Amino acid sequence: MNSVEFPLLDRRTKNSVISTTSNDLSNWSRLSSLWPLLYGTSCCFIEFASLIGSRFDFDRYGLVPRSSPRQADLVLTAGTVTMKMAPSLVRLYEQMPEPKYVIAMGACTITGGMFSTDSYSTVRGVDKLIPVDVYLPGCPPKPEAVIDAITKLRKKISREIYEDRVRSQRVNRYFTTNHKFLIGRSIHIGNSDKGFLYQPPATSKLPAEKFFKYKSSAPSPSHELVN
């Protein structure tokens, strides 16, 4: 397993004083104490529960599971996310302090999995709701893969600049808790690739903040969510 590299922490003076920046020091302290909020809804979460045992021992990474989003800086979604779960997941994410990170674990979380073709109540990808930092495919992923995903997230944090992260999040649009999911009628015309199309009301009747958390500088032709 590769170790986390710090580009500025190896510059030592003759007096054995580490020369670094406050940003690198903050990143080092955060990656050594990631406190996850476990959002498990199906079988993928059982694989993550295996990490608690002595065989994998995820405590060595500083991972301390928290039950409150206000004490967590990492949310790990494992399993299917339904339409009814979506507002609560977004609410939990908004209650987490900055900086915060997301790991999407399993095919059902990333794309909807086996429910992505003809299910009327499944969200086809958790990245439609909250920004995802690391995608972990599998059905379900092995505990070794979860450790590898956490290692990659630690490497990402070690090279991160907070201002760049905030700027990149503002480019994308994510739903807030004020957004209401409406179930559309299914369209069965014989093709398995036909999904469910949701068209919100006209934007002239509702303010823009009802739909999106961040405003994008690029114009969008329409506001449609395909699940």
From Swiss-Prot:
It is a peripheral membrane protein. [4Fe-4S] cluster binds at residues 43-44, 108, 139. It holds the Pfam family Oxidored_q6. One of its GO terms (biological process) is photosynthesis, light reaction. The keyword Plastid applies. Its EC number is 7.1.1.-. Its cofactor is [4Fe-4S] cluster. InterPro entries: NADH_UbQ_OxRdtase-like_20kDa, NADH_UQ_OxRdtase_20Kd_su. GO terms for molecular function: 4 iron, 4 sulfur cluster binding; iron ion binding; NADH dehydrogenase (ubiquinone) activity; quinone binding. Binds 1 [4Fe-4S] cluster. It comes from the Eukaryota. NDH is composed of at least 16 different subunits, 5 of which are encoded in the nucleus. Belongs to the complex I 20 kDa subunit family. NDH shuttles electrons from NAD(P)H:plastoquinone, via FMN and iron-sulfur (Fe-S) centers, to quinones in the photosynthetic chain and possibly in a chloroplast respiratory chain. The immediate electron acceptor for the enzyme in this species is believed to be plastoquinone. Couples the redox reaction to proton translocation, and thus conserves the redox energy in a proton gradient. This is NAD(P)H-quinone oxidoreductase subunit K, chloroplastic. The lineage of its organism: Eukaryota, Viridiplantae, Streptophyta, Embryophyta, Tracheophyta. The gene is ndhK.
